[in-house]
Amino acid sequence: MIKSVLIANRGEIAIRIARTARRMGIKTYVVRTAKEPEAVYLSAADAVIDFPETDGNIPEFLDIDRLVGLAREYKIDSLHPGYGYLSENAELAERCRDN
């Protein structure tokens, strides 16, 4: 059973995922980026994780290594990509399966 989810997206989709997960009794996490430190979607989740500084080569919501690393570090048992970004990336699914 899923107990927690890292929402690897932003904006309205993150709000909708968080709302639904909360109704299901799942603890929700979102990432805060330096570009959007006060974004509305941050208040929709149970917890906010500051995204580590990047070198700018990989946009935050496309950085599979860091997203999977955050999920492991915070002992989050699932990762939801929302739509766009990593939602159609098979590598994300494989990395989640392997971790």
Write out the residue ranges for each language-model feature.
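ATP-binding N-terminal substructure of ATP-dependent carboxylate-amine bond-forming enzymes
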Residues: 1-99
